[in-house]
Amino acid sequence: MTKQFSMELAGRTLMVEVGRVAAQANGAAFMHYGDTVVLSTATASEKPRDGIDFFPLSVEYEEKLYAVGKIPGGYLKREGKPSENAILTDRVIDRPMRPLFPKDYRNDVALNNLVMSVDPDCSPELTAMLGSAIATAISDIPFDGPTASTMVGLIDGEFVINPTSAQKEVSDLALTVASTREKVIMIEAGANEVPEDVMLEAIFKAHEVNQEIIKFIDTIVAECGKEKHDYEHHIVDPEMYDDMVAFITPEAMEEAVFTDDKQTREANIRAIEEKLEERYAENEEWLAQIGEAVYAFQKKTVRKMILKDHKRPDGRDIKQIRPLHAEVDCLPRVHGSALFQRGQTQVMTVTTLGSLSEAQRLDGIDVTETTKRYMHHYNFPSYSVGETRPSRGPGRREIGHGALAERALVPVLPSEEEFPYAIRTVSEIMESNGSTSQGSICASSLSLMAAGVPVKAPVAGISVGLVTGEGDDDYIILTDIQGLEDFFGDMDFKVAGTDKGITAIQMDIKIHGLTEQIIREAIARTKEAITHILHDVMNPVIPAARDHVGEFAPKISQYTIDPEKISEVIGKQGKTINGIIDETGVKIDIDESGRIDILSEDQAMIDKAISIIKSIVEPLNVGDIYEGEVVRIMNFGAFVQLSSNKDGMIHISKLSNERVEKVEDVVNIGDKVAVKVLEIDKMGRINLKLEEKIED
């Protein structure tokens, strides 16, 4: 039996159908927002997965090209691997949902979102976030929801709830906020240097809207919700845990984790595990639980140190940033490079400049964006954490971190008109102990400036963490969290920005939400840290972008022609443009508006190519002198090619002021000559006079 529920959301109708499709899933919501349609399902395995110490949640956001009336390309004509946008949407759906499942739940859970129709005015990503929350809430899967999500834009100083595609194009803010009944559980934002107080206002505006959505979801759950099923609770044997704590002692564990060197700490923990392996060698059941038990003991120890003793594992104050170092020009022949280090986290970013034709082409369901001029790629090799594993290409985490850094830097990049280059930055993680994504933002900002990209302002990033106690007021916020504080803490609140304001936020938490007080304090803390990094570390290295691109970067000049003359520049089967390229060695890109980009490391060759193009598209003026080549000789004169599409004739009487008996006495085929235009007759024929021969 199908049941329908609807509400007005930002001037459009959100309609949810339950029972119409996918009845065999644990929960299914057929979502309609405007003309956007997404099927969201939640399914769980009947039994827990053996041998794991984590909750196995998978989230899939599937973009079907039929949703926008397109047929996939390629030989198979089927959708291939997920797009970058789909992977990022998977992650943004996952983040508010994961903390609300029981921590000891080991059944496989899959949240699938099938995008079936796309209305550009109604975000399919937001629809999928709401759909996953509803499908899980009405299912029998244990879940402490519901959650609700809202997008906020900022146009001319006014907030816009769930902006349309057209509004997003002119918005200074792209904010997504997910909430529970009382608290904010997820924040993701890209912004054009939005001040901190405006960002906070937008976050809490979204939280208010989310409360109305949660009331709507409650009505659906009340009518369609299933009773949550019982499950096998996965816990470490209490007797084993108590024996371990008594044997190792809390003091010894605190001593093991209290060091500013990651490898020393890992060696200390491994030594503890070896002692336990020896102690429990005869008890297979306890032996199998050592890893989880030691992890839990570490976590309890670290959280107590921070919360009760205000002591961090590496000895820092709660507001103290790890030692910082920055430098530029690390690599000799690249277009731009920089190294940024924060404690034992080290990132090198390399910038490469290319023609706009090298921008990334996007083939997905977003028909408003078909190319991406700025690309940020993030690589996290195994050696950065002292491990050995084969490289299989970027995973979801690497794609997500790259996108976060990209989002943080896009607002300060120059326009195509100001800087007609495609730009790629690659962040190579050399060493990792937490906050590599924020390190890549700092390194990339430095690298861009070193490459001569005229950014509006340098950008820095920082991550703050959180350890909570029993009540809402019992917490400690940590500036610049290292890996251990990320693993055992409750929050990873990443913020990037300039002196002027915020350019990106990404908030991940492991608890059931944050109070307004914590969010305000966290953003204030990031502002302090960003100011310190910019002024005390980055600016002394390179305070602003260089006024020229690097020695080995291509130079670009632009020249605009009448679009109707594009065919003249290209020539039949590309003969003309290829001739220019062969003669000058430049790279030429022409777009349909008539803009021509000419690239080369040699400015003289760029100038020569422009001169040739001008000779093709610009009309000849009577009385002006032009250079050309003699291409044909007749008994009455010589024909001179002035450009690929223009030639004229020098009558034998105009070859010299003296009488000429034979044309070949003055010029021959292949001679370079300077000629004056005497006349362009009604038929377009060009009559010339020889001024001089040009010697090689």
Regions found by a protein language model. Give the residues of each.
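Single-stranded RNA-binding regions, centering on S1/OB-family and related RNA-binding modules
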Residues: I290, F552-Q558, P563-D696
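Flexible, glycine/charged-enriched surface loops at secondary-structure junctions
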Residues: K103-V109, D144-P146, I213-Y231, Q263-T264, ...
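Extended amphipathic alpha-helical scaffolds
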Residues: M1-S45, D53, H229-E369, P554-E568, ...
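Flexible glycine-/small-residue-rich
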Residues: Y33, A42-A44, Y61-E63, N113-S117, ...
